[in-house]
From Swiss-Prot:
Gene behind the chain: pdxJ
UniProt keyword annotation of Cytoplasm present: yes
UniProt-recorded name of the protein: Pyridoxine 5'-phosphate synthase
Assembly and oligomerization: Homooctamer; tetramer of dimers.
Active site: 43, 70, 191
Cellular compartment(s): Cytoplasm
Length: 239
């Protein structure tokens, strides 16, 4: 049965919009866990635009399920991860001007630097995942780094505007699942997944955990976080 990791970055985004102390992502994480989330995901960006160092440290102390830290493959972030010790580190690309992560890591182009970051994190006792597009060359490169997991970037599927394009993207995801499985890598997925499209990806099988944030927080504004998480748990686990 697949798991749901709830990304709470946008709780911090709302807090930072006013520079205050609420809503607190630490409290949101507790509610998400009580509602059935299997894990909590956060992205500590280099520019600290939403999640802050304080949040990471408190979440490490309070999260009862699993804490997944999305991070750039920089010396600063690697050192922070080794110090705080989340349950998983997911290496993601990062651009200061982007509103959200726009694509997967180019592991082929940056193989040596990513491999070094993976090794340092693993030497620190951490499980490492790479956020990549469902591209066979990127998956093979990810395997060469020694990473434990890949997280399939589902953004292109989520943004498909017609049935033909959607089916083509689903086929890429399905092939990525098969290839990563053959290579012995764990498989997660995320980006752009919502209440309307998650069943289509979940029906493929083979994915261990879905990391979903924006759609859950958007629904939470209307119906509350507990209800929003419970509804997504039902879709992920019983697709």
């Amino acid at each position: 049965m697949a798991k749901l990791g709830v990304n709470i970055d946008h709780v911090a985004t709302i807090r930072q919009a006013r520079g205050g102390v609420e809503p607190d992502p630490v409290a949101a994480a507790a509610i998400a866990e009580l509602a059935g989330a299997d894990g909590i995901t956060i992205h500590l960006r280099e520019d600290r635009r939403h999640i802050q160092d304080r949040d990471l440290k408190l979440l490490r102390q309070t999260v009862k399920t699993r804490l997944n830290l999305e991070m750039a493959a920089t010396d600063e972030m690697v050192n922070i991860a080794i110090s705080v010790k989340p349950d998983m580190c997911t290496l993601v690309p990062e651009k200061r001007q982007e509103l959200t992560t726009e694509g997967g890591l180019d592991v082929r182009l940056n193989l040596e630097s990513i491999k070094e970051a993976v090794q340092r994190l693993q030497d620190g006792g951490l499980i490492v995942s790479l956020f990549i597009d469902p591209d066979p060359d990127q998956i093979k490169a990810a395997d060469k780094t020694g990473a434990d997991y890949i997280e399939i970037h589902t953004g292109a599927f989520a943004e498909a505007r017609d049935w033909k394009s959607e089916q083509a993207e689903l086929a890429k995801i399905e092939n990525a699942i098969k290839l990563a499985g053959k290579l012995g890598m764990g498989i997660n997925a995320g980006h752009g997944l919502n209440y309307a499209n998650i069943r289509k990806v979940a029906a493929l099988g083979g994915i261990e955990e879905y990391n979903i944030g924006h759609s859950i927080i958007s629904k939470a504004v209307l119906v509350g976080l507990d209800r929003a998480v419970r509804d997504m748990v039902d879709l992920v686990k019983y697709a």
